[in-house]
Amino acid sequence: DLTGEFLRHMGTRFSAAYSGDLSRQRETGQRVLDQLEDAPDLVIDPRFNEVQTDEQIDVMMPILIGRDPRFADLVAAMNTDTKSFQKIIETVFNYWVSHECDIGGIQSWADYSGGVVSAFEGAMASAKSGTDTAIFTSGGTIATMVGHVLRLTSDRVYEFYEPVFNCSITRIIFNSRK
């Protein structure tokens, strides 16, 4: 509610609003929009969903333990050391986005990032000049969009994933030529 109040106080008006289909994304988006005058309807697009970190950890942890004894040490400490858990997420994410990762049964980086970029470019293409569009999503999706805008290679995306906080605001300004 505070984010919506802040945006209302700032005079923000959105011409369009999107979110993934995760309940936290939909609920955040709707609660913000409920605080604004003349808010658009929230468009739900699952391509804005978060990275499936839990699934990746479950599938990739045994593979990474077998490849690197230091990773096994992180896993042993993850329930008592939050830094170890963050390093596990980082290692898993960076393996997932690498060209080495060819694991069936989970969403590939190419499929995930392709969906995010497609949804993001669709939102940009629909935006009219001088308007603001809201996308209520999660850290991995924001990092993927920022990586796309900055034309980063996939191994650089995690640098923008970890520092994103829940309910943070990332503003991307663009025009039709850039």
Task: Label each PLM-derived region with a short phrase.
Residues 1, 18, 131-137:
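Beta-strand elements within well-structured catalytic alpha/beta cores of enzymes
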Residues 1-45, 109-110:
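Active-site-proximal alpha-helix that buttresses catalytic centers in soluble enzyme cores
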Residues 6-9, 31, 35, 122, ...:
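Active-site catalytic microenvironments for nucleophilic, acid-base chemistry
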Residues 24-26, 50-51, 141-143:
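Short, active-site-adjacent cap segments at secondary-structure transitions
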Residues 29-30, 53-59, 147-148:
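Short aromatic-enriched loop/helix-cap "lid" or pocket-rim segments at secondary-structure transitions
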Residues 36-115:
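Phosphate-handling substructures
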Residues 103-133:
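A mid-sequence, solvent-exposed acidic-amphipathic segment
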Residues 153-177:
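Domain-level recognition of soluble alpha/beta enzyme cores
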